[in-house]
């Protein structure tokens, strides 16, 4: 079972609806077919695939526009299934007042569960079945070689979003040089994400009917 969300409340003020920095996100002429799900929710869905190593096969979506005048959704609930049959739940909202960033993920399996939140990015919480919760810290020497490679500063020091993005550019430069590129996002990731956005829109307009979320070439 995978539960993930990317929800904040920064667009929840109806009196700010005409702010150009907000308005374009819900205007199909500028944002396309989807609002909040394409803006934030798709990141949570991709994270679910990245962490589990399993691609999304199908989904069922429920979109809502809670602020009058918005043509695109500002809240999205999505159920999904992966290629290996894992059950997934996703919530993405821009009107969840009180939430600042709200990007997190939980994975529950046969032997335990884990959770990570972007607002506490240095820790992963892991609980084995029948055991105590363990906190794995960024920079800890017991982590994998890949985790160590991606840690830029010493343990207990905040890494920050810019350095996380910098890791992607480092891997991109390695790929250009022909060296091993780590877990670099690929064109396939982008194609799958776009297909999932269109599938979610298709599902939402049909009251949540289940839709194949895979691009045609991967079906």
Q: Which residues make up each language-model segment?
A:
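C-terminal capping/lid region of NAD(P)-dependent oxidoreductase domains
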Residues: 1, 202-219
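C-terminal glycine/acidic-rich active-site capping loop/insertion
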Residues: 16-21, 25, 58, 77, ...
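A general structural signal for well-ordered alpha-helical segments in protein cores
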Residues: 44-45, 165, 169-170, 197
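Glycine-rich phosphate/pyrophosphate-binding beta-alpha loops
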Residues: 68, 91-99
């Amino acid at each position: 079972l995978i539960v993930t969300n990317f929800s904040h409340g920064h667009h929840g003020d109806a009196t700010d609806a005409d702010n150009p920095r907000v308005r374009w996100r819900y205007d199909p002429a500028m944002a396309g077919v989807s609002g909040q799900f394409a803006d934030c929710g798709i990141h949570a869905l991709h994270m679910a695939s990245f962490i589990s190593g399993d691609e999304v096969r199908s989904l069922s979506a429920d979109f809502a526009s809670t602020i009058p005048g918005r043509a695109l959704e500002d809240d999205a609930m999505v159920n999904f299934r992966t290629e290996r049959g894992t059950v997934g739940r996703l919530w993405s909202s821009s009107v969840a007042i009180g939430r600042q960033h709200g990007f997190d993920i939980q994975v529950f399996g046969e032997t335990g569960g884990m959770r990570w939140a972007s607002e506490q990015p240095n820790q992963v919480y892991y609980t084995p079945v029948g055991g105590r919760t363990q906190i794995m810290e960024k920079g800890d020497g017991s982590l994998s070689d890949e985790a160590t490679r991606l840690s830029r500063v010493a343990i207990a020091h905040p890494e920050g979003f810019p350095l996380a993005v910098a890791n992607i550019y480092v891997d991109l430069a390695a790929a250009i040089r022909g060296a091993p590129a780590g877990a670099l996002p690929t064109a396939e990731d982008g194609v799958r994400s776009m297909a999932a956005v269109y599938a979610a829109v298709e599902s939402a307009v049909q009251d949540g009917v289940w839709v194949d979320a895979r691009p045609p070439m991967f079906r």
